[in-house]
Amino acid sequence: MAVAFYIPDQATLLREAEQKEQQILRLRESQWRFLATVVLETLRQYTSCHPKTGRKSGKYRKPSQ
């Protein structure tokens, strides 16, 4: 009994490898874009909700002796 195996040529293998690589790169880019969006939105909310902390103005401080 004869068994035939399909052996793809090099061009087909390269094309499939490039397609898989592009798919992985698109997925990676979308994940980084999502992470950057989450970080930026968190920072934006944090800066808009919390007033700046620092020294109070001079008129509320006791004068130095």
Swiss-Prot record:
One GO biological process term: regulation of protein catabolic process
UniProt keyword Ribosomal protein present: no
Protein keywords: Apoptosis
GO molecular function: phospholipid binding; protein homodimerization activity; ubiquitin conjugating enzyme binding; ubiquitin ligase inhibitor activity; ubiquitin protein ligase binding
A Gene Ontology cellular-component term: mitochondrial outer membrane
Subunit structure: Interacts with Diap2 (via BIR2 domain).
Function as written in the Swiss-Prot or TrEMBL entry: Activator of apoptosis, as well as grim and hid, that acts on the effector Dredd.
Note: Ectopic expression in the developing eye results in a small eye owing to excess cell death.
Designated name of the protein: Cell death protein rpr
Source organism of the structure: Drosophila melanogaster
